[in-house]
Amino acid sequence: MSDPRARLTLGIAAIALALYAVFFAGDYALHVLTRAGIYAIAAIGYQLIFGRLGALSLAQGCFFGLGAYAAGLGALELGLGFPLTLAVGILLPSLLAALIAIPVLRLASHYFALATLGIAQLALLVATNWTAVTGGANGLYGVPPIDIGSVSFGHGLPLTLLVWACVGLALTLSHRMTAGKRGLAVETLREAPLAAAALGVDGAAIRFRFFVASAALGGLAGALQAHAIGVVSPDVLQFHVLVLILAMTVIGGRASPLGAVLGALLLVHLPEWFRDFADYYLVVYGAALLAAIIFLPRGLAGLFGKSKMPPVETADAEAPRDPAPLTLSVETVSKRFGGVTALDGTSLTLAPGEILGLIGPNG
């Protein structure tokens, strides 16, 4: 977000969203905005690994669900308050990502995707069958609302503002990880890994940091989800959660964290606009994803990108009026060493200060 236009657009959008939430949105609209903010955090995290590094991870839904379960169990079983449940919700997915990163990130792209999908499915099986801890298919009920000291953020406007403040923190983290030379290193690693290695870019360390940061933001989103709705069930680990986060990232613009926010706002509101087609939401998401790929290859964020500047007309360069005198002039020189012809009719001229290398059969 170093582009001034992008910062201005983000600032205007944030102010407009805050004004809408404070003065115009009802309780249900605030609930939808809260859900959009939660998924925006998960999508910003996914944009780090998928958009920036180009690695198709299928475990972001797993990290989202793990964060929700960690926060729910921390509140219900350990009696932890909100700041601590939030920390647990971030820490547990981050630790899992750190443990699996070393073997998984060494895999080629399609094997990496399959490995992360296997981890996600394993997490779903554990959540469904480990009834003594996770509640099985019934899940966890009664996760307390968010209270910070004597201030309640349980629902309505306070919860919405808190969630979107976390969106701002997620955007800040993403920006700090991809700004300046770090961003150039990441882009080089994505487009030309061999060139990046030749330039001294530590690709393994970058992939590790981005994978763990992606999981941490997924866990943060899941923890907020658990407190926002008070229920955690195996549904948070289902494949459709990943599909939703992936669609948000692509439709919004995989190259931009702001695009992830725009994609979340759009796709969370789509079911509200098309309630009559609620049973076909995956079809709607698929159609929106296909349309974005065809008509908006840079996503919604591409609509706010830098405009192309017209080419600058330049005058033809004039030849120097007083050319420098020649120091050396060679015409049609030939040289043979036995049966090897080193030079055959070679001509060249050298001006003062000019350096010329002549490479023949012997180097």
Language model features with spans:
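Transmembrane alpha-helical segments in multi-pass inner-membrane proteins
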Residues: 61, 97, 207-295
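ABC-family P-loop ATPase nucleotide-binding domain
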Residues: 303-336
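Helix-loop-helix "hairpin" substructures at the membrane interface of multi-pass membrane proteins
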Residues: 154-233
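Single transmembrane alpha-helix segments in multi-pass membrane proteins
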Residues: 26-77, 99-114, 186-197, 202-203, ...
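Extracellular/periplasmic helix-loop junction at the C-terminal end of a transmembrane helix
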Residues: 119-153, 183, 297-307
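Conserved structural motif at the start of ABC-family nucleotide-binding domains
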Residues: 328, 343-345
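Membrane-interfacial amphipathic/re-entrant helices at transmembrane-helix boundaries
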Residues: 1-41, 70, 77-85, 155
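Alpha-helical transmembrane segments within multi-pass membrane transporters and channels
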Residues: 78-121, 262-263
